[in-house]
Amino acid sequence: MKIQSILTVLSSVYFLCVSTVAAQSEPELPKGRLLYSDGRHVDCYVISYRAGVATYRTNMKSLNILQTKKPALEAIYFYEPQIFTDAMNLYRAKNYGEAKAKFAECEVSFKSVDSLPDNYATLAGFYKMECSRRSGDLDALSAELEKYRKDGLTRDNHYLQLEVYTFWEAVRLKDWARIDRLATGDSWQGRKVPSELRVQLEYCHALALDELAKEGPKEDSSRWGPVINAYNRVLSADATASIDLVLKAANNLMRIYAEDEGVQLAIKNWKTEHEKVSSVGYQKLMEANTLAQFYKQVGFHEIQPLITDYEKFLNYGQVKVETAAVTKPDAGAEPDVEKAAEAPEAE
């Protein structure tokens, strides 16, 4: 009797351990709501969706696996999973490395429903690519975009961002002439896009013109005019839409001013008998001064301090930018593509 009792206890412990391990290893299923054409709805955990057939459980512990299909099944709405929420919080905090790992995990976990609209596998894959772009890993972005399945996207802004990736791919390849053709072509000229996307377009174009100007004849100083205008368009697109790109544009613009021989001469002759306020170099020095003042007034220097060569522009100027007229950007409040879809277009 004692031996039998011991065996019974051991068997119970064994099956308890097996059940616990199985429960722990079972992947999280997407929680959703099945919407039927007759008005009914059922909250459930979706196992898969293929060819119009949804396979699901009514709860995670249920052993009953059920199926429903079109036309009785009209749509499936998904609740936001915790892993996606965590990933988005990291993303908005600019912690792109950890956010990308979470998005990748979410993408794999919910792959079985990636053919449905607004599924979290497709959304996670999209934001995984955004993490690569924002962190500057264009090689990773290129590889991820090649494998990406976009069918589950429903927002126009997401599809627009996929189109803008064409510019980033050209940046990766350093195909500056192609970027110039894209930016000035019929597809984008005059096209209304949200500020978050407009900043990307203008920055890629400005970067391309910058690189093309470097290849031009040094004696032709006029070649920098279009570059300066292009970087100014980045700054005017929306200073809070994509802070990282705006900072790069501002610093590149000040680099151009600092390297300009006319500006250097204007600095040398500042407040001397040789000063020529009507010269092109003097006018550019005033532009550089205004930009440096703006950079500090809006708080950009708190995110990325001005280097000494650019801060010296503050010593040369006649007009001061009023602090009250400028709103400081919040570096941590950069809107994402999804939120931008809900905002009015800036262009």
Positions of PLM-derived features:
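TPR/TPR-like alpha-solenoid repeats
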Residues: 131, 169, 208, 215, ...
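Bacterial N-terminal signal peptides
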Residues: 8-18
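Short N-proximal segments of mature Sec-exported proteins
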Residues: 251-257
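Compositionally biased alpha-helical segments
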Residues: 23-177, 181-184, 188-196, 200-204, ...
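Flexible helix-coil junctions and inter-repeat linker/turn elements that act as hinges
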Residues: 176, 262-263
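Positively charged n-region of N-terminal signal peptides that target proteins for export
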Residues: 1-5
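Terminal, low-structured helical/coil segments at or just beyond the last alpha-helical repeat
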Residues: 222-225, 265-347
